[in-house]
Curated annotation (Swiss-Prot):
The lineage of its organism: Bacteria, Pseudomonadati, Pseudomonadota, Gammaproteobacteria, Pasteurellales. Residues 1-25 form the signal peptide. It comes from the Bacteria. It comes from Haemophilus influenzae (strain ATCC 51907 / DSM 11121 / KW20 / Rd). PANTHER family: ENDOLYTIC PEPTIDOGLYCAN TRANSGLYCOSYLASE RLPA. This is Endolytic peptidoglycan transglycosylase RlpA. The gene is rlpA. Belongs to the RlpA family. GO terms for molecular function: lytic endotransglycosylase activity; peptidoglycan binding. The keyword Flavoprotein does not apply. Pfam families: DPBB_1, SPOR. Lytic transglycosylase with a strong preference for naked glycan strands that lack stem peptides. Its EC number is 4.2.2.-. GO terms for cellular component: cell outer membrane.
Length: 287
């Protein structure tokens, strides 16, 4: 009886842990981007005001934090800071993918793109700073190395906010970029997408249908742009947007949005047959 009770308590504890912490993500496998494993759910505390060197800062919360996109200068921590405490209470580790930002929530995440070479990294915000008018973010040594910032010391970057829910789903400004980087259906399914995520010029008629579910298709690993264009021509879709993008030495097709799940499924089946079952991802989002 005691053994059974102990097992039940262990099972309950494991369940509580699984609810409290999202599943870890291999960001390189899912999106082709190295970074933090996204294992800490983002909390949204009320905005807090603090002062450093006579300058006052107010932290972001709610939709303001989630929608954050900004371009500006980034640098990185000197190795001498290894082992020092950060604003979150963490000890700074130069080998981890972390960063300091003045106003984004602690334990939220950011997708950082080096605008010089388009290399990307995902970091967890665990510190405050940099307290300089010129720099937006300071990266850990590992994060700076990943995007090729070490030799330059400082560089122009784009910062896109990313939040992690307790169930592991991802939301925020960075989901638009991650959607185009997704390598698997699982990676796409973790993204909480808005109607304009994959296409910048979605039709006004689609945008008007608030609260409706829409679907987009992405076919991966096509060998050439001509192959992608040939498939689009063969599909002969009327009033459905298509787009061809290069991904490394391969090409991808984006098709949609569809407001009819049956129509989307028909196009998906036809496309897979024509392309000999190349990898295909279905995106679902709500307007």
């Amino acid at each position: 009886m005691k053994l059974k009770t102990g097992l039940n308590l262990t099972a309950l504890l494991l369940f509580m842990i699984s609810v409290a912490f999202p599943a870890q993500a291999d960001t390189q496998k899912m999106y082709g981007i190295r970074g933090d494993n996204l294992s800490i759910a983002t909390q949204m505390p009320a905005p807090r005001t603090y002062s450093v060197k006579g300058q006052t800062y107010t932290t972001k919360s709610g939709n303001e934090a989630k929608s954050y996109i900004k371009e500006g200068l980034a640098s990185y921590y000197h190795l001498k800071f290894d082992g020092r405490k950060t604003a979150s209470g963490d000890v700074y580790n130069s080998k981890q993918f972390t960063a300091a930002h003045k106003t984004l929530p602690i334990n939220s995440y950011a997708l950082v793109t080096n605008l010089h070479n388009n290399r990307k990294v995902i970091v967890r915000i665990n510190d405050r700073g940099p307290f300089s008018d010129k720099r937006l973010i300071d990266l850990s040594h590992a994060a700076a190395k990943e995007i090729g910032l070490i030799s330059r010391g400082i560089g122009q970057v784009r910062i896109e906010a990313l939040h992690v829910a307790k169930n592991g789903n991802l939301s925020g400004a960075a989901t638009k970029t991650l959607a185009k980087q997704a390598k698997t259906q699982e990676a796409a399914d973790r993204l909480v997408l808005k109607s304009n995520t994959l296409f910048d010029n979605t039709s006004k008629s689609i945008n008007a249908l608030k609260g409706t579910e829409f679907y987009c298709l992405k076919m991966l690993e096509l060998t050439s742009r001509s192959q992608a264009n040939k498939l689009i021509t063969q599909l002969a879709l009327a009033n459905i947007q298509t787009e061809v993008n290069r991904s490394g030495n391969k090409y991808e097709i984006y098709i949609g949005p569809f407001d009819d799940k049956t129509k989307m499924a028909q196009v998906r089946t036809k496309l897979q047959k024509m392309a000999n079952n190349k990898p295909l991802i279905v995106y679902t989002y709500k307007n």
